[in-house]
């Protein structure tokens, strides 16, 4: 059995595993327990009332967090002509077509997000086995395949996060950093939960947002009392 560090043990002792904390207290605890030497990310896990095995209940989408993610994002765009110029003007670091595809095939992937204009999918489609496993394959469901590449670039730069339910019916997402003010983390969490609610499958029955828990990169998970989320 792995040995728990003194810091991890001390943090674990601060949190009651079965207790549901008011959101303000939950975020305060998470920030307090985020004692690593780097600016830890603040993450959320949301248990959804869906059957992830059913194709019509796969929850997937994206949302621009109002307070951003605290991360600098490098964007690559597949576009040509006017759309290529629009992508560059919007701040994309890399814009190309076959040349960009060759870079990717050669393992040169110095970017965090890939956006594609629909007319470039003949090129992008050949990269599925490379980009797919890395979570980088452009997809219209999350707004990364779009004719409006400029807006997509701006959204990515502004703090857009993508979400997709896992096999256990849980959504995992980052809502900021330890250095964020609690109000910023709350606004980001509210935006994410609103996006999840809007993405609720029509076939999902019963309670949809079942459990919400927040944590930091190296810290413990803290369950949230959902009744306090609207406060």
Swiss-Prot record:
Subunit text: Part of the 50S ribosomal subunit.
Protein name: Large ribosomal subunit protein uL1
A GO molecular-function annotation: tRNA binding
InterPro entries: Ribosom_uL1_bac-type (IPR005878), Ribosomal_uL1 (IPR002143), Ribosomal_uL1-like (IPR023674), Ribosomal_uL1/biogenesis (IPR028364), Ribosomal_uL1_3-a/b-sand (IPR016095), Ribosomal_uL1_CS (IPR023673)
Top-level taxon of the source organism: Bacteria
Keyword terms, alphabetized: Repressor, Ribonucleoprotein, Ribosomal protein, RNA-binding, rRNA-binding, Translation regulation, tRNA-binding
Known role: Binds directly to 23S rRNA. The L1 stalk is quite mobile in the ribosome, and is involved in E site tRNA release.
Taxon lineage: Bacteria, Pseudomonadati, Pseudomonadota, Betaproteobacteria, Burkholderiales
Organism per entry: Ralstonia pickettii (strain 12J)
Gene3D superfamilies assigned: 3.30.190.20, 3.40.50.790
One annotated GO biological process: translation
